[in-house]
Curated annotation (Swiss-Prot):
CDD domains: CYCLIN_AtCycA-like_rpt2, CYCLIN_AtCycA_like_rpt1
Gene Ontology terms, MF aspect: cyclin-dependent protein serine/threonine kinase regulator activity
Cell cycle keyword on record: yes
Protein name: Cyclin-A2-4
Originating organism: Arabidopsis thaliana (Mouse-ear cress)
Gene3D superfamilies tied to this protein: Cyclin-like (1.10.472.10)
Family of this protein: Belongs to the cyclin family. Cyclin AB subfamily.
Keyword Ribonucleoprotein listed: no
SUPFAM superfamilies from the UniProt entry: Cyclin-like
Amino acid sequence: MGKENAVSGNSIPIHGRPVTRALASALRASSKLITSSEVAATTQNQGRVLRAKSKRTALDEKKANAPKKRAVLKDITNVTCENSYTSCFSVAVENIKQIKKGRQSSSSSKVASSSATSQVTDAKVEVVSNSAGASLSVFTDTSLGTNETSYSIIAKPSSRSPPRPFGTVERSCGGASSPKFVDIDSDDKDPLLCSLYAPDIYYNLRVAELKRRPFPDFMEKTQRDVTETMRGILVDWLVEVSEEYTLVPDTLYLTVYLIDWFLHGNYVERQRLQLLGITCMLIASKYEEIHAPRIEEFCFITDNTYTRDQVLEMESQVLKHFSFQIYTPTSKTFLRRFLRAAQVSFPNQSLEMEFLANYLTELTLMDYPFLKFLPSIIAASAVFLAKWTLNQSSHPWNPTLEHYTTYKASDLKASVHALQDLQLNTKGCSLNSIRMKYRQDKFKSVAVFSSGELPDKLFIS
């Protein structure tokens, strides 16, 4: 009894239970008496094993409950070209992110240039950032043997000051000699304008427009059966379709972008070009419209040339090519913002200028060479030319437009001249859907307006 009491007095839990008298007797009978240190070591090791197992079990349960990852199918046609073009803008995006996070040194009083140049095949992007928080992205396309250059100046939005009455004049910079501009975001009464977040929203849109832009020479490099003329005929027909079904303008702009981006990376036969057009309009309608037209309606407008199954199959191919990320800022996206900035120079809202700017911007959808310009540049150029068309007695550009577009007049010279050629139809284009549309009285018949000669002094900053 004394020995048993001695053992039981130093009882140590084994496998989660204490060493009782009965257990001690059983261990002694089987000659498997263990010491306290051995039991402690055994218990510690078992505890580690149990903890490891419990972690692994929890991890397995977590994995079991998590949804399974599915491989995204992607069309790999011309994937080298796509990856090259994506990497072409990677430098711009990274520099913009650094600007937004405020990584530049605030002690620098001069322009601190952190420039990065990335050259892929025939294209080059150069990003120059300065201490004021502005970023200039320069896209040079030398593939066509020209020195065409697109500029994208992205200014970091400053923190919003307390609300002021609409029309309050601010200074764009801290210097006394800086030009003044009107704060169009000071009107906080209309919640749809998102005045508080508008600078950040359009800053992000300016970053997004640099991504997934089709090369302006994909017709020559990717397509062998589809031509520039066929693309123009398709867009001209889609303008009529959008009018027939009273679709919003954003649907048309997004449709044309989807067509160009798909043609940029995939070879398409001419017999399937119209199928691609109605499919892209179907996808854009689902994204932009409240009540999108049904597939059968799109088949009907092609005189039942294509079946429902063919449209669904093409829709699947397009969505896979885009990895289901179909949205991009278009010229219409920026035109709304720039028109609001342009209207402050008028005592009353000018509907003629609004319709004329929309007309000029839509004309660029049919013109394949305009792919070399950024959407924001096209929108700014449309406002510039619209103001010049309506009033040639004053300069069409002012500090307010320069502030909100981030473009100087000198940056728009090439695009404005190209847009004026479209307006005057110097090439004698026979596609008239957009011109007939804007000759209607509801659009103030702005298609009949013509602009005078553009003197070089307009583009001197």
